């Protein structure tokens, strides 16, 4: 019996060591997250006014927090370089591929020929639209500082994309394809808001400064 007790004690000590190591690793990762989060804040502060305004305006969209907004602005750059929403959709590689056979055109999987990092971020954001439209406190506060046109676009995106998600899932489409379709339309709203920021020259307005 004493040997069994010793084995039990040794096992507990080993478990405690492993648990302590995991806690230390979690703390270190939390410190890294805080470090990079602060670095992102500093980068936003040093960015041109128009960039700061765009980053803030995009956060009015559901599923687009600070890091996602920064990624979108960094990867897309000037939204005005795309004349139509379909062009930025193609840039992300979220448009269906097409195959011609005689007189018939068939659509296949998405091309994936565009910016893969941007595409991944959009798909992650698109998952948020499975929930019913609502404004979280952060979004309410943010939209209060934005022009009505941008706030209206963000709300319209919630209504449109949630409905899109519901209709496609009702057709028993695979969830992956449904979210990809939602992501494709989401980039259209992102493009529209980015263009609106540029058109209104919001970079000079204090109420939309980051």
Regions found by a protein language model. Give the residues of each.
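A detector of single, family-specific signature residues
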Residues: 1-210
């Amino acid at each position: 019996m004493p040997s069994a007790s010793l084995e039990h004690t040794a096992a507990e000590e080993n478990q405690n060591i492993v648990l302590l190591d995991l806690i230390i690793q979690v703390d270190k990762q939390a410190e890294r997250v805080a470090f990079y989060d602060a670095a992102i804040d500093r980068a936003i502060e040093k960015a041109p006014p128009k960039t700061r305004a765009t980053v803030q305006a995009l956060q009015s969209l559901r599923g687009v927090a600070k890091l996602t907004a920064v990624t979108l602005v960094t990867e897309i750059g000037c939204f005005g370089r795309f004349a139509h929403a379909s062009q930025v959709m193609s840039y992300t590689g979220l448009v269906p591929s097409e195959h011609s056979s005689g007189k018939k055109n068939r659509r296949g999987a998405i091309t994936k020929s565009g910016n893969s990092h941007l595409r991944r971020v959009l798909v992650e954001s698109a998952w948020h639209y499975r929930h019913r439209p609502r404004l979280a406190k952060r979004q309410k506060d943010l939209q209060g500082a934005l022009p009505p046109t941008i706030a209206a676009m963000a709300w319209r995106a919630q209504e449109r994309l949630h409905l899109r998600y519901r209709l496609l899932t009702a057709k028993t489409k695979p969830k992956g394809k449904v979210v990809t379709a939602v992501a494709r339309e989401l980039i259209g709203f992102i493009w529209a808001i980015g263009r609106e920021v540029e058109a209104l020259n919001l970079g000079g307005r204090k109420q939309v400064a980051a």
